[in-house]
């Protein structure tokens, strides 16, 4: 595999959907041989949108972190191969006891969180979990 970016020259995206989309469109236009993008947080669904808008579906694929409807849609379309769900409710629930243990006893608790890879066959279940988390029906 040939990596176009590295830790020292990574792509600078943001939490703003429009800017992230534009960064990915520019990146893919300048690097038409890219085949795979890994992204975190909101970025993957906007990389997916950029791939689709440039007509690169089936040529460029993604994987992304955290659950979103846009990523689940892209998995169903075959653009995104998986979503790595960090399980937000578990993340949130861990913070209070971890802080309490550290502040009271100086103990750093090990991370008990498990990562859940969501592929095409798990999209329906992931949508239900996301809707429950976001209280969207």
Model regions and ranges:
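A residue-level marker of the well-folded mature domains of exported/periplasmic proteins
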Residues: 1-137
């Amino acid at each position: 595999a040939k990596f176009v970016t590295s830790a020292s020259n990574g792509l600078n995206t943001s939490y703003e959907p429009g800017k992230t989309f534009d960064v990915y469109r520019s990146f893919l236009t300048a690097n038409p041989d890219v085949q795979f993008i890994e992204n975190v947080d909101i970025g993957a669904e906007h990389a997916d949108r950029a791939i689709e808008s440039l007509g690169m579906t089936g040529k460029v694929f993604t994987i992304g972190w955290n659950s979103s409807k846009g990523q689940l849609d892209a998995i169903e379309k075959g653009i995104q191969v998986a979503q790595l769900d960090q399980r937000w409710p578990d993340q949130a629930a861990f913070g209070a006891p971890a802080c309490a243990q550290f502040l009271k006893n100086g103990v750093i608790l090990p991370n008990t969180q498990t990562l859940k890879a969501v592929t095409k066959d798990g999209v329906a279940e992931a949508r239900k979990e996301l809707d429950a988390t976001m209280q969207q029906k």
